[in-house]
Amino acid sequence: MWPEGKMPIGLNKNQTAGEETESPNGIVKGVSVPGFEVFLPTNGAKRSMAVLICPGGAYGCLDYDREGRRTARFLQKCGVAAFVMKYRLRQYPPKARLADVQRSLSFIRSNAKKWNVSPDHIGVMGYSAGGHLAMCTVAVDGKRVYEPIDEIDNQSAKPSFAAFVYGAYFTNKGNISPSVKAAFNTDIRMFMLTGLADLYRFSTVGFFDGCTKMEKCPKVEAHFYPEGCHGFSVSTKPHNDVYRWERLLLTWLRRIASEDSSVDAEECEYLSMIPEGQDE
């Protein structure tokens, strides 16, 4: 993703990168070479929307399989191109991981023709800490946190839309975190959800409450479930309401696509359904 020797924003003082590892259950640690894994739809659509997925893990690790690959495979089956991020973690300053996301958005746009995705329909999605990272990406509104390094950075780093699943760190002691406050003024479409049994519920609820108090409310769709603890992801429990949130997400994506004449409605028809008994 970054040209050799040109990756911006180095390690924090007295930190070492270590070696990247992935456990048998898909927990990734020690990311020092950021990048993303590509999951392209196979349904023959001329173009598709694209979602850059930021797994959570409290910035100490990445729940890469459950909140990354599993979500990507689900979107892929439904005709949406998905890209799972490996971003730099707490050994690096916060701007490092934000730079990784911005670079990824520009990289995907620069390869939109190759991957058959619409450059105007490339969004970001995050779980937990990854949701905070996605929200920070919205807040900076495409303004890069690093100096452009090549022609890839001529492409926009602004997400077309953003989704946050049980996002964390939007608030701090009851106040909106400075890192996301500017997102109240965005024109980016947003989708958020959380379970009200989640210890981090105040993050999503607090941000949504702030949106409702704005003179010009952002375009945000929010869903709150009376059940659901932190970390439910795309689940194998299809009969529990909180585990069917992905239907709502796909309906929202389809609505965005249908409002833009540059994407044919026929090409987005697959976004209207998820197979019954979906288990990934």
Describe each model-derived feature in a short phrase.
Residues M1-A45:
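N-terminal cap/lid segment of alpha/beta-hydrolase-fold proteins
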Residues R47-G56:
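Short beta-strand element of the alpha/beta-hydrolase
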Residues D63-D65, M85-P119, K237-V242:
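Catalytic nucleophile-loop/oxyanion-hole region of alpha/beta-hydrolase
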Residues Y64-F83:
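Short amphipathic alpha-helix adjacent to the substrate-entry channel of hydrolases
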Residues A99, R103-N185:
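Primarily recognizes the serine-hydrolase "nucleophile elbow" in alpha/beta-hydrolase
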Residues F191-T194:
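Short beta-strand/loop motif that positions the catalytic acidic residue
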Residues L199-G206:
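Conserved alpha/beta-hydrolase "acid-adjacent" motif
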Residues F208, M214-E280:
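C-terminal catalytic histidine-bearing segment of alpha/beta-hydrolase fold enzymes
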